[in-house]
Amino acid sequence: MPKIAFVNGSYQTINKPSIKIEDRGFQFADGVYEVIALTNGVLIDLNFHLDRLNRSLREINIEWPTAKEAFNAICAEVIRRNRLVHGSLYIQITRGVSARDFSYPKGLKPSLIIYGRQSQKNQNLTKIEGVKVISTQD
């Protein structure tokens, strides 16, 4: 099954994304990203990650590319289309497309990319649940 990503309004196979060459994220790393763990089909600490993403966007003056309800629906659809159970969701939001220059015009439309990665169950659970240890004297 091909991996599917959400790229600027459409779902595409991950090996054929359409990112504009003059996207400021590509040219200047002008954007933010967030990675959210997925366990048993559930995004872990989703509100924490969305708050941090919101704060990061606000700090560099990038508008949210979509409404929160639509954003959550896109995340759920990427998980569904990729049949993800355990893994992570990668979210990248850039300032958008503009002619290559250090300054940028106001009102750019932000770019949004979301894709998921499958991983083994215990990789995420170890990070989330921790591991049990017993300490002994040397």
Q: Which residues fall in each region the model found?
A:
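Conserved alpha/beta cores of soluble small-molecule-handling proteins
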Residues: 1-138
